[in-house]
Amino acid sequence: MNLTNITEENEVYKKHFYDSIFLSEVFDLNNKSILDIGAGAGFPSIPLKILCNTLDVTIIDGLNKRINFLKELSEKINIEKITLIHGRAEEMSKDRLFDFVTARAVARLNILAELALPYVKKDGYFVAYKSVNYQAELDEAKNAINQLGAILERIIEYDIETDLTHVLLVFKKIKNTPSIYPRQFAKIKKQPL
């Protein structure tokens, strides 16, 4: 089953695994919870879980074949404390909030912020994996970030032996997100905050 466009083994390690685990060099993930939105083949959450067994992982993805793959993978490599949800982030219950919410290659930041920040605990973090060309997205997302109760805490640029510089945009949740968010996806896409 092909869940990623990158198939050369060395490139998979660099562009998926190393990129995914960089978050663990920035934060202590022990005994924390993470929601991975649109995880696809399980990046960044599965490598982070392998690295940090006490990390409580929840993955949501809109394609059932991806969720089925991740379920099979989790069973084969004996991953525990992992919840797999077939669905859309904006339709997920807000009963549970997370220490971290992550997303890689899901949407532009002004849309992604509304999908992610409602599920971050106060004083928790939304971490967006982006390329070095993040500035335009960041500029257009400033209003959304503010309305959803977060601030940009830091921008971390890093290289992983590829031709690209990667970036973690780290947003800290400083107040609760208004309960009207996230809106339905059609509205988020048509009228981003």
Where are these regions (language model features)?
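A short SAM/SAH-binding and catalytic strip from SAM-dependent methyltransferases
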Residues: D99-A113, P118, V132
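SAM/dcSAM-binding transferase cores
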Residues: D139-L193
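Conserved SAM-binding loop of SAM-dependent methyltransferases across substrates and taxa
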Residues: A41-T54
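A short acidic, Gly/Pro-enriched loop at the edge of an enzyme's catalytic core
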Residues: E90-F100
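Helix-to-beta-strand junctions that scaffold the AdoMet/dcAdoMet cofactor pocket
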Residues: V120-K122
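Conserved SAM-binding motif I beta-strand of class I
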Residues: D56-D61
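Class I SAM-dependent transferase core
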Residues: M1-N31, L35, K65-I82
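Short alpha-helix immediately C-terminal to the canonical SAM-binding loop
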Residues: R66-N68, Y134, L138
